[in-house]
Amino acid sequence: MSNKLTAIVLAAALSTGSAAAGTFDFNPDFSVAVDAGSTGIGFEIESRLNEMFQVRAGFDWMPHFEFPMRFNIEVGDDGDPGYDSEGRSRFDRMAGYLEDMTGFKIDQQVDMIGEPHFHNFKLLIDVFPFKNKHWYFTTGFYAGPSVIGRAYNRTEDMTTLMCVAMYNNIYDKVYDIEYNDESELNGVFLGLELPPAVNERILAAGRMGMHVGDFKDGTRYMMEPDENNMVKAEMKVNAFKPYLGAGYNGLIDKKNDRLHFAFDGGVMFWGGSPRVYTHDGTEITSLKNLNGQVDKYVNISNKFKVFPVLNLSISYRLFNR
């Protein structure tokens, strides 16, 4: 679709400007520019080749900022807190066992930090089809990393996540003793032997994890720490992103023909709505019943099947044509 629109823009420009004498004479100038807007902040090198065409190359990057996410650690995959007669949840009981065995205290909440990772090289061609040579159409592309955002747990929650991984390892060892014949070698158990009553309680409780959302079949997705005891996610789009837009270029000061401003508006075609993956490869955007904050962020990102570009730039012409 973007290729067809590009062809239409160029054809219209050529047909409109072909009658103007000297329109296509090659007589370039060079300018440098700074810009800011929805693509971040950046710089450009510009060359007005003739009355009709201008070429721009540059780099934009999004300044650092953070947005929070919070998850509750649960035990088991049925969504039931499992309160006992004393009002303690399943998590409270298992966290107590873990503290008794290891001395580590586990918090039920894990905070994650989301931050942009959006930077792109750009190559753009402006076409000035009108007589006043201020309004223009633009085609070109942006290119950068496919990962445009990352999320990871706060450093303060590393101990909690280490405890979650430790508990799940204990669960696996207990499970092996009860149900996995391969855990026995020459009559010796390779798992972890605890008092039978403790084994029963751990197995009845289930594994620890953070409920992020549900798969389409209704199964709950429980995110667990990776091998480094961290939880992470990445937001991805296409690395190559065609661009179509329009803009206006004018003088800042009529007495100084070297200093210009420009407004650009258009769309970056980045391959549909961004996709979000956790460290274990699960695509969050395909889940339903997402956690509150995650649901809000995913709903927002799903609306952006293309990325809107709205930028302001100021340029200085190094030498005139």
Show the residue positions of the predicted features.
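Outer-membrane beta-barrel "beta-signal"
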Residues: 305-321
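Transmembrane beta-barrel domains of outer membrane proteins
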Residues: 35, 44-46, 126-128, 247-249, ...
